[in-house]
Amino acid sequence: MTRERSPFLLSYQKQVQTTWLSLRLYENTDLLIDGEKQGLGLQPIFCQLSSHKNVNTHVIVTGQGRGLSKAGLKNFINEKNSSCEVSIYDLDIKTNNKIGVLELVFQATSHFLNQIQPDVLLYIKDSENYAIRGIDSALLAASSLGVTGISVPIEDAEHLIWLAHLPIEALKHWNTPKVQVQVITQDRPDSLARLVRSLKSSHFFGDEISLTINMDRGADPVTKEYCRTLEWPFGQKNIRHRIVQGGLMAAVVESYYPKDDHDYTVLLEDDVELSPYFYTWTKYGILKYRYGPDRVHSSRMYGISYYGSKINELYPPGRRPFDPAIFLEGTNFPFRTPYLWQVPCSWGAVYFPEVWREFHDYFPARLQDLSGLNLQNITVPETRSNRWKKSWKKFLIELIYLRGYVMLYPNYENFMSFSTNHAEAGTHIHLVEGKPRPNDIFGVPLMEEDVVLSGLPGGRLPNFTDLPTLDLIGNVVPREELIQRGRSLQSEVSLCPPSESDELTFDPKDILCVNEERRQIAMDEIEARKELSKKLHTAVKFIANHTLDSNDEMEVDPERLLNIVLEIYNSSSISPSIVDLPTSTQTSAVEIKILHDDELVTEPQVTQTMELSHVTPKVQK
């Protein structure tokens, strides 16, 4: 069988000889379009891409026989009155044979990739389309050229215009970040189902998204069955069930540990609901600030919030209404610009791997110190979170303050957000009769229509250095001031001096340095307390194991029996010769708290309930 060859290959070879020098002086983006529907979907994107400076945009169509020719695409562009400086090439495929189409597209795409070596090739994702299979095969064969293939489902194309606002440097990393979703749940199956429905309605642009549902030990049967039967078409589904109740703090922190620096996680509690455009905000922000030129400035950015907060919970007296527009008054920043805030969001956010890995080292070290030696008093100045007892955010806020880290927040009109919290009863939410429902306080409207770009100043995400920075209270401050505040606190709580370098190690060891002499003193005190506890344990058991003679008519002062216990406790050694309590068939009601050997006490802890009438202890002379 004779292979068909596209006339494009012969004519294009002559064109390349005259344009080769100009092609290599500029970055190149290519789009391959198979048919009119794809052309309609991708036209706004390639026209916007063509406006990039020093970027050549090439569009390849498969021909009139496949639904769209070069002339047809030109007419369509003219009808749209688009300013669109693109080079259009027509493969003019005439065959209807599926394998023939695949081979012709493979040949043409391979030739194009080898000759132009574009930075990016954008096309529609469709595994049933043999022309698209030809593109996939050509990209695979030319993998050594380093061309980034970006394939998106046709239904997502109309929501992809933000891609054209990214620099080519960022687009080349389209497939680099891997985003996983971690859901925390226990016994709210209806809430969980609502969250999953919102996830399924989102635009993921062809990315593979793994979903992990983390159930605590107390998960009810309905929740377990829902998780078992749940279908997740966007990637791998994982179900985890704890055998020991861990609580919300452990459930959140232990749900995710990054496998590399491109492994991102979306943390969601089950009473959160998402906008269909939450992943647009996620991927746009990650590519913009992590993989483009902005990355040299954004190393202290630890995540992206989906929730546009209208409450600041960190004021020392208590929660206060919060509107970033008010804090931006009198500055040069637009009222509705996204902003960088130190406060971590637990109501829908994506967290970055380096800082979360650092937090995984910092958090257990702090817990261990607080439950043992208590050598570090890390108190964030004028912040309510210092009083929190069961929140993982308390410790993350400490780390954030010490490092000067920030999170990106949306700031759309009327607090429109990519997530909302329904604030249903749970670990930190309690419904109180006669008071406003928590959802009325914390709930925000979801972005239901695609206004991701139109709601931003200038219609795009600002450069990192153009974003305002807010401290924990919400005041607009220079980023350098946040860093200096953290260094100042570190100087107070750690023996290791803070680094003056802007290069981050994401290792908390320098924060956790303590005086070794003080550590040894504290350890000796702990051992002494353990020894005292053992002595008291022995003394109390010695007394409690003797029955008391109640035949005598003399009454015993309850304090005297307690003094016997304390005499034994305070002695340097425990000896039966100190007291001699005879046995009796009658036992009085004596209740004394006996400490376990591993319990620590700072002073004798004896609880007594005594009914000692007609009891005579016999003490040796």
Where are these regions (language model features)?
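Peripheral/terminal regions associated with large enzymatic or DNA-binding modules
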Residues: 2-267, 272-598, 602-621
